[in-house]
Amino acid sequence: MTAETHLQGVEISAAQFFEIWHHYDSDGNGYMDGKELQNFIQELQQARKKAGLDLTPEMKAFVDQYGKATDGKIGIVELAQVLPTEENFLLFFRCQQLKSSEDFMQTWRKYDSDHSGFIDSEELKSFLKDLLQKANKQIEDSKLTEYTEIMLRMFDANNDGKLELTELARLLPVQENFLIKFQGVKMCAKEFNKAFEMYDQDGNGYIDENELDALLKDLCEKNKKELDINNLATYKKSIMALSDGGKLYRAELALILCAEEN
């Protein structure tokens, strides 16, 4: 079955949802925008008509919002709200725990328990299990394993079998995902280390809130297109959620500001 056929379904399984996303996010950048989004809207309307189904209220609202917009951009979270996805899988995209970047960062700290800078499949499975338990949902271990594998395939952009902070952050709604803004200001390791040492003014090996404030102000000043100084407090709060009792160590800040080097 093709992605277009899946759109005709009354309920879409987790595996079908992945296929739909993979098909329409044709450039693999983690978002549907421009032509991709318009193709999806057009084919969604055609598929529902072909199946003799009306657009659901969520679909109508979505088409009204993005149908004419040339600058529209949606992520996986937004797509999950539109399609009639199986209930337990849908819960991951409606999680109250992940409504803001700050909440997300705190969640990341909890599950990246070994501070490796990524979450492996076992850590991801624990994360998903906890989300379901918070929603008072119990599912069989085999189903949880299936969800974990699908999520890994869906978010693992570089196919290394584990999720980095920016990859898992696609569980956040686009508007909330401040990490998107920082993609354009990441530094190479040499630049990052130099900046860290410059702003770690007392040389104690970590950056505190005031030092981070100074660093972010300078970044906003140098990168006005990407970063908005009016959002400085939000950036700071979200990044400090990665800190250890107010101490932001090099490895944690690197997750935000240091580009991966191959």
Swiss-Prot record:
GO terms for biological process: calcium ion transport; intracellular calcium ion homeostasis; sensory perception of pain. Residues 12-47, 54-89, 99-134, 143-178, 187-222 form the EF-hand domain. Keywords: Acetylation, Calcium, Metal-binding, Repeat, Vitamin D. InterPro entries: Calbindin_Ca-bind (IPR051001), Calbindin_six-EFh_dom (IPR029634), EF-hand-dom_pair (IPR011992), EF_Hand_1_Ca_BS (IPR018247), EF_hand_dom (IPR002048). One of its GO terms (molecular function) is vitamin D binding. SMART domains: EFh (SM00054). The modification N-acetylthreonine is found at residue 2. Ca(2+) 4 binds at residues 200, 202, 204, 206, 211. Ca(2+) 3 binds at residues 156, 158, 160, 162, 167. Buffers cytosolic calcium. May stimulate a membrane Ca(2+)-ATPase and a 3',5'-cyclic nucleotide phosphodiesterase. Belongs to the calbindin family. This protein has four functional calcium-binding sites; potential sites II and VI have lost affinity for calcium. This is Calbindin. It comes from Gallus gallus. The lineage of its organism: Eukaryota, Metazoa, Chordata, Craniata, Vertebrata.
